[in-house]
Amino acid sequence: KLYIQFAKNFGKLANYPRLKGLNKKYPQITVVQRKESDKGPSFGEQFHTDSIYTKKPPRFTMLLSKLVPKKGKANTEFCSQYYAFKDLTKSMKRKLLSLKGVYSSEGPISVTTKERVKEKGKKIKELKSTHKIIRKISSNYAIYSSPGHLVGFQPKIKNSIDLKKKLFKHQ
């Protein structure tokens, strides 16, 4: 209850679109769990932007850990996408400013999410959306992309795999 009250200080709460919430009383709380039987990358293991595959992704998400694995097993890291944009070459900035990313809930990061969906998910089809890769927020530009969900670019470009690799390495 306190967690929900705290979260409401930042804005309207949203439900995670792929999994059922904790219970009927707290549908906005999603249990993020790694099981011994899971294969592939852990739920959210790679750098990503939460729910980027929705038309209007949440402005923020919060984590509260009940069980913390040993160091190196579940580290949460943060990075500034403002600085990431500033550090791009001029030619890369121009290229990315002209593109939108196509994002999918079935992207490469979705292995464990698919396992959770089978267990206690919502029956929904693939979610896809398109967003500018570079966003202007206030007076600053920032990279807005998610390696685990990016499946293409608009307009389509040659060597998109190379561009994805460069972008993700930079982020």
For each of these PLM feature ranges, what is it?
Residues K1-Q171:
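Non-heme Fe(II) oxygenase catalytic core, chiefly the N-lobe of the double-stranded beta-helix
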